[in-house]
Amino acid sequence: MQNTDTTKYIIHSKINADGVIERPDIVGAIFGQTEGLLGADLDLRDLQKTGRIGRIEVMVTAKGGKTKGNIFVPSSLDKVETSILAASLETIDRVGPCSAKIEVFQVEDVRAVKRKKIIERAKLIFTKMFDETVPESQELADEVRQSVRVDELTHYGKSRIPCGPNVLNSDAIIIVEGRADILNLLRYGIKNTICVGGTNIPPEVAELTKKKTVTAFTDGDRGGELIIRELLQVADIDYVARAPDGKCVEDLVQKEIIRSLRRKVPVEQIIEKYGIQEKESEDSACRLERVSKRKMRAPEVVPRIAEKKLHKRVKVHRVSPKTEAYEEESPEEMEEAVTEKIPEKAPEKVSEKSLEKTPAAAEKVEARKAVPKSPVMARPVPAARVPRGKPSAEKVSAVKVPGGEAVRVSPAPARQVPIAPVSPEAARFRPHVDALKGTLTARILDSDDKVIEEIAVRDLASRLKTYRDNVKSVVFDGVITQRLVDIASSNAIKNLIGVKIGNIAKVPADMEVLTSAML
């Protein structure tokens, strides 16, 4: 008996007979007319006894004196032997007393059907029955490292602000933007970190900065700049470190983190860079907004000086209409003793007309200062250079110091930065600049100034590398760096518009680099 599990092929054939015949007649004709035809190895009776050939199935119908039907022969032989056996069936020309014809029309591969079922079932098992894949070695290491970092993460204050484990014990702390930044720094062993969670600085963090040496470490985008501005107003920081342009602290590797922290700058330079001005109090007298902890050292003993006038040397520059070059005067012309006490009142403004009437006032800038009765001394305000041939009247204001008196100071005149001429065609980018203001996003434009894609500024450099010739202009809410200029030049980009221009050494002649202020 043929085992269906071992069947490899099924021979499909059809029979036509001129007469009425039945199944036993057809089976007898198959065994009788093929006996001894193919030799002892392929004799159907022997093959059926050994299980190489299965049960022969016959399905016939008789109609109008003729018989038609199909014959199915299962085989576990190989392809060659099965083909020989199928061909031998077509040699049968008579069944009983009737003439007949057998024709093979298909050899079915049973294993192919099984393979299809196996594939379909395997797809179902793979998609629905595997809950999780086997992780790779790197994934296992990252998971263990991440769990250790999460265990080390602690919280500070009633607001449960995320921070590193050494924030309270360390003399110096690092302020970052979010929880992911703390986890990345913990990964490389930096544990004295605390986050602010955006531009809304928590009061606990502002109070903590008064007791520590603080370094603000922010992202290299406009959001990081806004956080620094907020910290300068509500907290007391000493240094500022920035991530590379377009990168976030949470994405930096160890080498980039160490390099950024080593390049930190004092907060005084940041105040000058961002142009943060001193605020005025309600009584219209200027007050000193902040004093750095590194410079605020209380003296041991300060003797009280009453009714005594001190002389202070102030630099004075002469203004000459003959030349426009900057030129320093001799030491005799740059020194003058000035002493005068000013009553505590609103700051005075000296108009240009009054300065024109007195030539001495147009040539010299005087700073008058009284001795404060407090240990904290007011810093001298150095006079700024005035270019020759460009005289201007200076505004005189009074700065209130803790001694109850006021000091008349002359603020340095603002530098006039020449703005490069902008072509009239560049004004067409103004709508894009206005739409992107404060969004930290970028627009990639084609030759018709149509928006191809709008992405985040942090992804701009990597995304521009994927474009080839269809990009002609880029407008973004960020700083134009040398790296962006080089990438834009390699992609034949003609216009690069940002918020401001960073340290750029060279710009291609066929590229126009503009800022939003120029438009």
Swiss-Prot record:
The biased composition feature labelled Basic and acidic residues covers 338-356
* Cofactor note (record): Binds two Mg(2+) per subunit.
Where on this chain does Mg(2+) 1 bind? E177, D219
GO CC term (a single one) = exosome (RNase complex)
Pfam name, any one? Toprim_4
What's the domain of life for this entry?
Answer: Archaea
Reactions that this protein is recorded to catalyse: ssDNA + n NTP = ssDNA/pppN(pN)n-1 hybrid + (n-1) diphosphate
- Cofactor(s) essential for the protein: Mg(2+)
UniProt keyword annotations, A-Z? DNA replication, DNA-directed RNA polymerase, Exosome, Magnesium, Metal-binding, Nucleotidyltransferase, Primosome, Transcription, Transferase
Assembly, per entry: Forms a ternary complex with MCM helicase and DNA. Component of the archaeal exosome complex.
State the family it belongs to: Belongs to the archaeal DnaG primase family.
Task: State the function annotated in the UniProt record.
Answer: RNA polymerase that catalyzes the synthesis of short RNA molecules used as primers for DNA polymerase during DNA replication. Also part of the exosome, which is a complex involved in RNA degradation. Acts as a poly(A)-binding protein that enhances the interaction between heteromeric, adenine-rich transcripts and the exosome.
Q: State what protein this is by name.
A: DNA primase DnaG
**Source organism:** Methanosarcina acetivorans (strain ATCC 35395 / DSM 2834 / JCM 12185 / C2A)
Gene from which the chain derives: dnaG
